[in-house]
A protein has these predicted regions:
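Bulky hydrophobic segments
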Residues: 1-116, 122-123, 129, 133-151
Length: 151
């Protein structure tokens, strides 16, 4: 019994830590988020030995778009095991995970209305939700492939 409780706490701790990191990143001012994206863009250009004059903006823009998808895909992947351990219902946990991710996907964009220099973006909201769908789909595939969470 104690081991099950520990697994539940650890699963939810992972979700909470990820949510705090996401909240921190989405609450940054525009200058700060641009600086972080620029640093990552330079790192990627150097890693792939791409010329900055040609590739800077495509990589910068692609990175910012991919970040929306990746952040919420990871959240969905973290949420499912926490929910399945808590509810002990794997099938409903997919829906709960997708629903919770969807609410957070919309809420993170709406929260930007309160941050100076940031704006709420419907395309970003849709990218966030796409990440939720992809993450949930990935958990379905992983569960089928490795029989994780089957009882």
């Amino acid at each position: 019994m104690k081991q099950r409780h520990l697994k539940i706490w650890l699963a939810w701790a992972g979700v909470l830590i990820w949510c705090v990191l996401c909240l921190y990143l989405s609450s940054q001012r525009l200058a700060d988020t641009t600086r972080l994206s620029a640093a990552l863009t330079h790192w990627i250009l150097g890693l792939l030995s791409l010329p900055g004059q040609t590739w800077y903006m495509p990589v910068f823009d692609g990175l910012r778009l991919a970040a929306h998808i990746l952040v919420f895909a990871i959240l969905a992947v973290l949420l499912w095991p926490a929910l399945v351990l808590t509810t002990q219902n794997a099938h409903k946990s997919y829906l709960y995970s997708l629903g919770a991710c969807g609410v957070l996907a919309v809420g993170s964009e709406l929260g930007k209305l309160l941050i100076p220099g940031r704006h709420c973006s419907l395309p970003d909201m849709l990218l966030n939700f796409l990440g939720c769908l992809l993450g949930t789909g990935l958990t379905v595939l992983l569960r089928r492939r490795f029989a994780v969470g089957k009882r």
